[in-house]
């Protein structure tokens, strides 16, 4: 892909990930804290929003590796699949059921406060939610999966942006061959509390996976398959479905609609008694499953609130724009490194958007007042060093 190679574009060498580029664009000083100083936010005992995603990614990865291995399409796989910082890891040939069993054990070792935090956010204990989500995910995409040949899972890639001295690298959740369309696709899996409305245009402008498709091109050449022509997004809702409720008259309560078809059918079972509106009980009865409700819950509109996928073509023009932007940002990063070495700090992007939710905000304010050469204990600002032996100023 042709890129500008003017002398001012050439950097001695800079290696970057998408996350690094994004953070530097937000604020060079925040980038310095993370990538030069090695600072991270202190981990709390429980971070269910983040941790559930890690657990589901592990289940999903082993599911896809198993499929690729069984069908003989798998070209590459990691040695291990990880869950959370405090959770277990698994060999590449483990099964999803191994993760389920480990989740039960992990849950059993959590303290009462940690469990409460999980339940408040997730709506169910981790083992039950993980099992339900995985089962429903397989049911939802089973037919589509028959047309997919898994090539790689958790695949690392790196590639130089031509003529710039910039090397980009990252990890792709999955690379697969779409047998129906005859193309190779890079897929990104995302979990979130609820699934909002995401358009194809939004996903096309998400440069991360577009860049990954570009970065994986040479590996696809080595594997003897075509280079990626599309990117896919596999979105999964984390929060558990609610339990349906009945009114006294035996009607579904309008106040609770946030449940899926499986939850509804399990709740109904052989029927749910209701007391009726009359005091003598003569209007009591048993609620049974309604065909209209089953049809509603099985509709694409409702199902997409729990699981959603989109396929977006790789645009060479879009990729070129993002590569040029990446090279430009890496040029800025090189300047940040020089300034940080000389002055002990970097440029700051002042403003509510950059500072309001920045994990380094408290330390940043302290150093603006006291200067970068003072003594600042990371833990006093809710931070920790990635390297435990690091001694900060």
Residue ranges and their predicted role:
Residues 1-393:
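RecB-family 4Fe-4S metal-dependent nuclease core
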């Amino acid at each position: 892909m042709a890129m500008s190679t003017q002398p001012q574009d050439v950097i001695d060498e800079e290696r970057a990930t998408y996350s690094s580029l994004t953070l530097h664009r937000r604020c060079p000083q925040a980038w310095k804290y993370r990538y030069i100083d090695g600072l991270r936010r202190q981990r709390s005992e429980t971070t269910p929003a983040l941790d559930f995603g890690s657990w589901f990614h592990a289940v999903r990865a082993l599911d896809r590796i198993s499929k690729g291995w069984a069908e003989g399409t798998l070209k590459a796989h990691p040695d291990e699949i990880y869950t959370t910082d405090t959770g277990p890891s698994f060999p590449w040939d483990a099964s999803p059921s191994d993760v389920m069993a480990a989740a039960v054990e992990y849950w059993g070792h959590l303290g009462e406060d940690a469990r409460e935090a999980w339940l408040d956010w997730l709506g169910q204990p981790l083992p039950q939610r993980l099992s339900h989500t995985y089962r429903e995910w397989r049911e939802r995409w089973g037919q589509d999966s028959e047309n997919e040949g898994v090539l790689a899972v958790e695949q690392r890639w790196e590639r130089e942006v031509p003529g710039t001295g910039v090397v980009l690298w990252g990890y792709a959740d999955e690379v697969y061959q779409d047998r129906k369309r005859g193309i190779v696709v890079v897929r990104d899996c995302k979990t979130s509390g609820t699934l909002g409305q995401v358009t194809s245009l939004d996903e096309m402008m998400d440069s991360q996976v577009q860049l990954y498709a570009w970065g994986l091109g040479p590996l696809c050449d080595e594997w003897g398959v075509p280079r990626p022509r599309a990117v896919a997004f596999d979105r999964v809702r984390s929060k558990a479905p609610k339990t349906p409720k009945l009114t006294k008259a035996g009607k579904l309560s309008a106040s609770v609609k946030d449940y899926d078809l499986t939850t509804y059918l399990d709740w109904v079972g052989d029927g749910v008694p209701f007391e009726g509106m009359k005091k003598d009980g003569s209007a009591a009865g048993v609620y049974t499953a309604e065909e209209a409700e089953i049809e509603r819950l099985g509709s694409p509109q409702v199902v997409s609130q729990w699981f959603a996928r989109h396929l977006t073509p790789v645009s060479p023009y879009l990729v070129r724009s993002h590569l040029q932007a990446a090279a430009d940002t890496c040029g800025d990063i090189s300047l940040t490194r020089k300034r940080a070495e000389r002055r002990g700090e970097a440029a700051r992007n002042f403003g509510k958007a950059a500072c309001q939710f920045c994990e380094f905000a408290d330390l940043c304010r302290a150093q603006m007042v006291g200067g970068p050469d003072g003594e600042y204990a990371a833990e006093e600002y809710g931070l920790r060093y990635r390297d435990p032996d690091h001694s900060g100023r």
